[in-house]
Every structure is written in C-alpha cells, then in structure tokens.
Amino acid sequence: MTQQNAQSTSEPTISENDLIAQRHAKLKQIQDVAKETGKSPWPNTFKREHYAADLQEQFKDQSKEQIESAEHVYVKVAGRVMLNRGSFMVIQDMTGRIQLYVDRKGLPKDTLETIKGLDLGDIIAAEGYIGRSGKGDLYVHLEGFELLTKSLRPLPDKFHGLNDTEVKYRKRYLDLIVNEETRKTFEIRAKVVAGIRAFLTNERFMEVETPMMHVIPGGASARPFETHHNALDMPLFLRIAPELYLKRLVVGGFERVFEINRNFRNEGVSTRHNPEFTMIEFYQAYADYKDLMALTENMLEKLAIDILGTTDVPYQGEVFSFKGPFKKISMFDAILENNPQFTPENVGDREFLAKFVREELKEEVKPGFGLGKLQTIVFEETVETKLRQPTFITEYPAETSPLARRNDDNPHITDRFEFFIGGRELANGFSELNDPIDQAERFQAQVAEKDAGDDEAMHYDAEFVEALEYGLPPTAGEGIGIDRLVMLFADAPSIRDVILFPHMRRKEG
C-alpha cells in the first residue's frame, strides 16, 4: 500500500475544538431534558457511601465464586469516568479505580443510552452490588446510575498521556486526573507534613502561627518581596523566615514551638528553588544545636520508615540511608577533605582564599568580605554538591551566621549546623544567640554589608533586640525545607514536581 493510500484510509482526526463542541451539544441535550423534567442538569443529592480502594481492600481475598455464592453486597460509589467500553466502565475517585459492569438486560433503555453517550472525564454516581470478573477484576454490577457533572473538555489521550512538563505545572488539576504518580507524590507530601507535626507534638512542641507580612524583613539572608499597606501607608515585606517572631514566643515562655508555613524570597527559580516555599521551623529552650541534630536524625529516620517502610531512600539512581547517626564534620574540615590541594593554613588565610575565589571560582570578592565569608563561598562552590549521604556540616563562621551563638572555645565560629543530602541543603539549625548586645552588634555589621551592596544582608531589628533584653533562655532552633524533603521521599527531580501550583512565567497573550 502506498503512503497516499495509507493516509486516505486512516481514521479522520477530530480537532479538540470539535470534541469540545460535541460535548457542549450533549450538555445542551441534558439541560433540555432537565428543564422538561424539572431536575437540575448539575445534580447534588447523591451521597457516596463507598470508596474504590476500600472496596478493593475489603474483597481482595474473595474469589469470583465466593462473591457470587454469598449474599449480594450493595454499594454506592462515585467518580470520574476513565474508560467506557459500553459493557463496562472504569471510574476513578480520590482513592483509586473500580470497574462498573453494565448489564444490558437489566438496565432501562434510556439509562443504556445515557451510558453510551458518556465521555471520558464525566463524573457519575453508581449503585449496585459487588462482583468479580473472570479475569479477577472487582466490579460494581450497575443497578442505578446518575450523571453528576458533564465534562466539557477532553482528557489527554490515554496512550500519550500528559507528558508536557509545562502543561503539567500550569494545569495541575489535569495532571492529577491522568497521572497516578503525581497523585502519589502529593499523598507523600501530606504524609511528610502530618508526620513532622505528629513527631513534634509528641515531643511537647506547640504549633503556632506568626505574621506573614513583616515591617522589617528578617530571620534569614535573602531578598524579600515588598508590598504596601494602603490604609497604614507603609511598606511591608512578605516574610523570608519566621525566626525572629518564634524566638519572641520563647522569650514569652512557650519553650517549645514550631510553625509549618510559607516563606517568600524574591530570588531565582530552579529545580531546587521556588519563590514561595514551605518550611518547618522549631525552637526548643534549654537545648543546643547538638540536641537538634539528634532530634533531626530521629525524626527523619521515623519519617522514612512510616512513609516508605525503610530507611534506605532511593533518589534519582542513588540510595540514601536515613538510618542515624549521620556523619558530622566542620566546614573547615569539609573544605580540606574535598580540596586536597589546600592546607589548614590556606583555609585560614583570607588573602589566599580571596585569590582562589577570584581566579578559580571566577566570583567577585567585595572589599567587605572577611575570612568567614570567603570560607563559606569556597564551601558552597567546592563541597556542597559532593555531600551525597546525610551529613551535618558544623561550625559555620560567625560572619555568615548573624543569629547563631558564638562557640565558647572559638569566637570566630558558631554553634551552627546545616544538613545536606544528595548535594543539597535540607536544614539549618543552631544554638540561638541570646546575648542582646552581641545581637545588636551583628545587626550593625549586617547593615554595613547592606550599605556596601549586599542585597541579602539583614536589616537592624530593634524590636527583636528589645525582646532579647527581657531574656531568652538558652535555646536552639532549626528550619527544614519541606519541599526538598518531599522531593527525596517522592523521588522527584524538581521542586516544581512537589508543589501543587509552582510559579511559572506568565504566558504571552
């Protein structure tokens, strides 16, 4: 057969606009019938009593013969039509899928005609009794049926699915309908959040809520989003971190607090960064950073077991062990371990590191950059991506840790850690700075850096310093990125895969 003949005998392709027009025509028929009978074309009186997954679980051990020989079990289900073959359909609800058997001899003619005219994506209610096919599939033997919602747009072709990444992000509702893996990802996300909440609540932490709009951006080094309060005629900033408010609560006597909420940072978008993201921050009085490292080990190990059933977490071709204790190493030693060309003297030499950053890393060295800032740059550029298995990096420079407590033995470093896995930072924690005089001086140093051109340096927060002057007990605090943690448990390559509605560039037109 020639190419021309093959094309001439192929099925004509129906455009999406034509399919939409056909569905609108069907809706018009439904509306006309509803008008004649006095019923609503969008009924809302059906009450579902059963879910697909529950029925699959309930009858999983019963054979076709056992089900047929027993008394009929009647059920009421509802869901979206994912397959319609005339004699049987498949509907999908929030828990999974189940078949509906259409008995042509036992149903009225008008019901059969309605079923025949169903489109994929329509939402229906069904009543009947449980059965099992010769192939072993559980089904509902249809005795009652109602169209609840007419779908006016066709679902993606079942053979090609929804594979366009941008469409998946922009139309997440469509992605959730047709892609089971996407639904599983967000079920994992819900379990992660619930698991963290339960773990901390069990440890006597109290969940709180703090402001999302701040008069002064603080709590982290980042560029904020700015807005304006019309009634008060004043600028406000979407929060970059809740830290300074949570520590005020510890001053007030809430000795163990946590908050799960959004932070906003007016920075770049990548596979690891979204301008709006979810964090868990928690603070514990009468504890230090070592206590929080232990708590983090216990919490992550429990999450892995509860969600995945194992402490071996597969991620993008690697396997990460969430079985504690995790590796712990200072930033200074991590730089040496991953840069064999360096000596301890090199890592402690500002001029040497400044030259290395300029000439080897090709990054600008501003006049205000001290030794600690340069060490941090070298660490971020030469070490971070090599930290594959769970690792705590400790002893961060005081220069880049304006809210952390100085180490008692070495005032140039702080009692701080960052937690890395798969080459990515997942958590940041430290013994809190509770010396109001030292805090004021560090805020002043940050202001000087901001004046020198560092957009991410912190502002001076006089109200927070005043709160510290009333007395903050010895305290440790930590923040964990929920989105990045979900990426690990869901084996998702991009942060956009674990955020229901990630930020996208506005479409032209």
UniProtKB/Swiss-Prot annotation:
The secretion signal range is none
**Where does the protein principally reside?**
cytoplasm
Top-level EC class as recorded in UniProt: ligase
According to the UniProt entry, what is the EC number of this protein?
6.1.1.6
For this UniProt record, the keywords arranged alphabetically read as follows:
Aminoacyl-tRNA synthetase, ATP-binding, Cytoplasm, Ligase, Magnesium, Metal-binding, Nucleotide-binding, Protein biosynthesis
Q: Which gene encodes it?
A: lysS
Q: Report the domain of life of the source organism.
A: Bacteria
Specify the protein name. Lysine--tRNA ligase
A single GO CC term, please?
cytosol
The record lists the organism as Acinetobacter baumannii (strain ATCC 17978 / DSM 105126 / CIP 53.77 / LMG 1025 / NCDC KC755 / 5377)
